[in-house]
Amino acid sequence: MALATAAGGFAPLVDDIARAQERSLNPVHERYPEPQLPLAEAGGKTSPNDSLAAAIADAYATNPDLAAQRYVLRATDDEVGVALAQTRPRIDLQVSGRYDLTLPGDVTNAARPISDRLNDPNIERDELNSQLAIEQPLFTGGRAAGALRVARAQSAAGREALRGVEGDVLINLIAAYSDVRRDGRIVEIRSRNLRWLEATLDEISARREAGELTRTDLAQAETQLEIARVQLNGAQAQFEASRASFVATVGRAPGILAPEPDLPNLPRSADEAFRIAETNNPDLAAALAAQRAAEERIGLAKSEGRPVLSLRGTAGTIGPALPFVPDDQDVIFTGGATLTIPLSEGGRIRSRVAQARNEESAERLRVEATRRGVIQAVVNSWNQWVTAERNLAAQELQRKAAAIFYEGSLEEYREGLRSTFDVLFAQNSLNEAEIDLLASRRESYVARAALLRQLGLLEADRLLTNAPAYDPDAYLDRVEQRNAVPWGPVVRALDSLTAPIGKPQKVAEIESDAQTARIEEPAPQSVPGELVSSPSPQPAITVPDRVDIEGGSR
């Protein structure tokens, strides 16, 4: 029992002696750092003070592209007010004054009384006119109704365009946020690698002086050290570029960023993604609204040939201007109705209708082009997400294998079974595996955000809770209430009853003969041969003299 206790007390001393002997045989022992976990797992010592939610809230409130698009939508909504004004009364006040001085001739003087001629040989007249006119359209032939339909369709397209810009801003923000986190970690990895190589170079230099290593070992370490410096410089430049992108989108510098949170509303299958995009993609919805506006313009063009009926009443005064005496002014009241019937416009209306139909056909084709583009974008985003997730699984295994490879190479190097190059290569493999893993995590997250953008689900009010949201309808409500009159809805209802309906034309199709279509074979001489240079000498340029410039002849 006592022997066992004594043996246990000597065990630590024996271990210390063994380690001292190993250090004497291998001076580089314990100078290489142990394999480190990737930074994504090891975690930082500094607590995050910035988050994706805070960045989204700041960008939603201050991003200039998003704010500019809101004002673009407001300007589009103002067209609704312009259309509504066509059914509201128009009030004008007109005031005019006139002064006439006549130097009469013999014929005029002969007709004038002698007293007038003696009192003032000249004839002076002054007059003051004032008129208040009120005109109320009763029937515009559908012009007002058509203009209102076009304006509302344009307003709907503007709302979808605003959603699209918001999605673009958020996808840029999420990409910049992920880039800053990824590139910051890459800078840490490159810095750690540089410090490790500097320590390694010191040890190799010492061992070479001791005769244990060759000049080749030293050159290998020096080469890897300089490569590490270049890689660190590139990583730092990329990190600053990512920070600049963040500042451009958010309007402030990023802090210590927290990990990206899970994104909500992701589809469970590709088929579900296609169904959501078909009904909710803002680009497609904007194209459909623009096509509706173009269709309404057909009816608006037709309405230009319809009769217009309006009521007009005036109240005015006319009398001497100087001296102004109210009792000397005549008061005149007039009232009437005006019916205007277009009979011939020289083909202008028919041309406008044809023009509107052609524009509608173009918008309809743009809808199909947008739909195809949306499908392509959904496919690309989905596949990027799937590919990134697959790469993540493989790169997790790659990182673990690289860590084992590095640890094993280091232990074997201590035993003299591995060369300096083997250890350097293993350390570099571990670094690159960590960087590849960070890149794949970023690609996966950004691909998910890009997919949500195409589905119309990447919006601030869907991502944030209890965040103030911009309400575009508030401004439109104010536009509709400007100068509103109680009888306005009645006039609009009467005008819309007879408003013409725009009928789109059939889009002309070009027949395709894909079975017999062939690429024309080039002539033999059209095949490129040797490289050529510009001909030398260049042809001389004739400079005209002064006579030629001034238009004369030599």
Where are these regions (language model features)?
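Flexible, solvent-exposed loop segments that connect beta-strands
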Residues: P104-N122
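Outer-membrane beta-barrel translocator domains and adjoining extracellular loop/strand segments
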Residues: L103-A110, G146, A258-P261, R306, ...
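Transmembrane beta-strands of outer-membrane beta-barrel pores
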Residues: G97-L103, L138, A315-G319, I341-E345, ...
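Regulatory alphaC helix of protein kinase catalytic domains
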Residues: Y32-D58
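Residues that define the transmembrane beta-barrel architecture of outer-membrane proteins
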Residues: D126-S130, Q329-F333
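A glycine-/polar-enriched beta->alpha junction
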Residues: A57-A67, R74-R90, E124, Q131-R149, ...
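Periplasmic alpha-helical coiled-coil/stalk elements that build and connect Gram-negative outer-membrane
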Residues: E22, D50, A54, E166-T279, ...
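Acidic, low-complexity, intrinsically disordered peripheral segments
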Residues: L13-V28, G44, L101, L438-R554
